[in-house]
């Protein structure tokens, strides 16, 4: 008998077995491609905190476009992405008349070099659009330089004005996506359809767990489904992560179904993995003062927290903490909710709670924003703000 293969794919950007809760977005985009140039949903800006499935949605848009005969170029927004788009078009259609200047192969692109590159890029984009259509997807927009974004945006706007068969979708953290559309030279992107990815409902998540496992050859006990749904906290990445490890636990025992016990063990393994992959690397990029801001937020009551209350917890004035707050917003760790009110958004579903309990130690806890996942860990803290993150161990708390 053929061994059932684990259907869950908890790898960043990899397509899951089922795309949950995005049907309307995909239907609107497919119809826009069918309706031709000028359809509003051909321009799309996708925002969301980490773990909400932005890259996966871009992949799905690309799959739809390919099925309709479009050429699709997917790029990340780090330095040199305009040149990478051009290189991809050259590879795909063998545009021998276009040559890439060695001066723009590096990371640093001067304004003169960029103008030359953009001229060739526009020609390549127009040629691809004439043949069968062109979709460009741009991911991690927070990494994009303003200059390159303007160059690509200007070329795209010109093609749209010419009635070319093009589409453009870009994704990133909420503040970075908002920052792009308010740029004076990219105002046309304000008309792009805004898709804000939020947490999935428990109903959607629970149904997906059951359907995915059943199609792959395992049943899911009712109690196990409830545990996995709660642990995922509505985040697509966590759905894949806890589903993957719960399946593995059941598979190793030779079970034909995923029991509550397998779900609990799988959730614990997923939390360990989540800590190593997501939490610890994120905290390494947070300065001591920024972490104190996060810790102060975690000690405040409620979910949406006033900046004044955070500053008070830190023993500082509200104006004094402004720079820490801005960096945390830019990093996607906290989210503005209203005037001077903020919400913790620690990567996918975790926030940091901190409280001292000994002179030389601090107790750390990580919990979901909605309280769905609660784990704790403790670690000695050495001088110099070294939190010993490489040695963190996570345990489930009921």
Regions found by a protein language model. Name each.
Residues 63-81:
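Conserved catalytic segments around the Walker B and adjacent sensor/switch elements
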Residues 234, 240-316:
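Winged-helix-like regulatory helical subdomains adjacent to P-loop NTPase cores
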Residues 1-42, 91:
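A short, basic N-terminal segment
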Residues 115-175, 182-185:
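Conserved Walker B catalytic segment
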Residues 41-59:
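Walker A/P-loop nucleotide-binding motif
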Residues 349-366:
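Short, amphipathic alpha-helical interaction segments positioned at domain boundaries
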Residues 315-330:
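Short amphipathic alpha-helical interaction segments
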Residues 197-224:
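Conserved small helical "lid"/interfacial subdomain of P-loop NTPases
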């Amino acid at each position: 008998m053929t061994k059932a293969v684990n259907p869950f794919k908890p790898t960043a950007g990899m397509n899951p077995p089922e795309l949950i809760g995005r049907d309307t977005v995909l239907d609107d985009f497919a119809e826009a491609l069918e309706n031709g140039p000028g359809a509003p949903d051909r321009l799309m800006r996708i925002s969301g905190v980490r773990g909400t499935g932005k890259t996966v949605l871009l992949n799905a848009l690309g799959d739809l476009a390919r099925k309709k005969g479009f050429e699709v170029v997917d790029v990340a927004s780090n330095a040199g992405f305009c040149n990478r788009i051009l290189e991809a078009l050259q590879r795909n259609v063998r545009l021998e008349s276009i040559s890439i200047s060695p001066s723009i192969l590096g990371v640093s692109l001067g304004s003169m070099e960029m103008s030359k590159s953009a001229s060739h890029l526009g020609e390549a984009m127009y040629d691809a659009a004439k043949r069968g259509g062109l979709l460009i997807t741009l991911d991690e927009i927070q990494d994009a330089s303003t200059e390159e974004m303007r160059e690509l945006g200007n070329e795209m706007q010109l093609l749209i004005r010419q009635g070319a068969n093009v589409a453009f979708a870009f994704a990133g953290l909420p503040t970075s996506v908002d920052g792009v559309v308010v740029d004076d030279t990219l105002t046309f992107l304000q008309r792009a359809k805004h898709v804000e990815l939020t947490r999935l409902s428990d109903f959607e998540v629970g149904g997906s767990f059951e359907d995915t496992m059943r199609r792959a050859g395992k049943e899911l006990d009712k109690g196990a489904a409830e545990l996995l749904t709660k642990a995922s906290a509505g985040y697509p990445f966590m759905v894949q992560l806890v589903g993957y490890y719960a399946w593995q636990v059941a598979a190793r025992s030779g079970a034909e179904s995923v029991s509550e016990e397998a779900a609990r063990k799988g959730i614990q393994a997923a939390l360990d993995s989540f800590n190593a992959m997501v939490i610890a690397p994120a905290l390494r990029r947070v300065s001591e003062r920024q972490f104190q801001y996060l810790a102060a937020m975690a000690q405040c009551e409620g979910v949406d927290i006033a900046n004044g209350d955070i500053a008070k917890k830190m023993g500082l004035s509200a104006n004094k903490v402004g720079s820490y707050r801005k960096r945390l917003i830019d990093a996607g760790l906290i989210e503005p909710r209203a005037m001077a009110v903020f919400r913790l958004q620690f990567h996918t579903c975790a926030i940091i709670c901190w409280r001292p309990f000994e002179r030389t130690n601090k107790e750390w806890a990580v919990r979901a924003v909605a309280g769905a996942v609660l784990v704790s860990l403790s670690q000695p803290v050495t001088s110099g703000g070294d939190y010993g993150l490489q040695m963190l161990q996570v345990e489930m708390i009921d």
